[in-house]
């Protein structure tokens, strides 16, 4: 029997682009999915651009009908995009034939569904051996050994020879995760894997995913549980078939997903070289800035003394709000730090003020930030 072919599996560490030009392990480029029916066309995904790097743990969140499962189906090849590209490692998934898709998926993806889908007439160990059989990997003895070792990982090796019906729901889901790992895939995709479990079992299953990531696996998981999603290294928020900008979501969490999408459509991406000024103290400013890459430093002028740096801001933080809410000239100089360029998402004054009128909670939160920053500035200008 064949052993896993490292030439056919995706490389976990990549310093250069993959064969199709993607630098991330998983990339969706301008993906559109339209479902046709007698009632008309329904666009489930709208120009989706997503990157997931090797070794990331990404949670996909959003309300029912937002496009989460459709997105997962694009990555796994269970469904095909109407247009756009789906790239996983060196493979253009959207171009694979049905036969090629099945073989590629069996060796490169571990898939876990909300419903366990274990075959009821096979033992727990035999269920785990199925993917190895399908891909013709390992000898029979090696398959049996791998099945037991995988069950040890999920702490169910003592249940190996039982039928699935003898296990609880949480135990069956852990078996499903072990089965997803049967062929040692670099990527694990999970669609609502904790949806039918109580909180204790959901936490145990989530911990398994965290352990897999610590060992180098890449995990993409759809979840409706916001508390679990926060434990992932990154979240992708979907709303009405669109991806909400993650930096907008981090900077303005009180907005609804629909408001975040609306704001994202109004943003201008601006890049500043290392060490360059974005705002100069005493100048005029008519934009609200959210940092998306790099870091900035906040410097204050002081009478009879040198300028002082009082703060540093990172991706997901913002600046420029003081002048838009309080008026007047800029109160500080904002510069890109010397070590790297800075990318910011700029929102025009009119759209920013409109946003505040639409979200009272956001307005109150930013107003508190303004008060705190003005106090910090006053303290920072003092010369002892």
Name these PLM-found stretches:
Residues 24-221, 226-229:
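ABC family nucleotide-binding domain
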Residues 82-85, 240, 286-287, 293:
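Conserved coupling/switch loops of ABC nucleotide-binding domains, chiefly the family-specific signature
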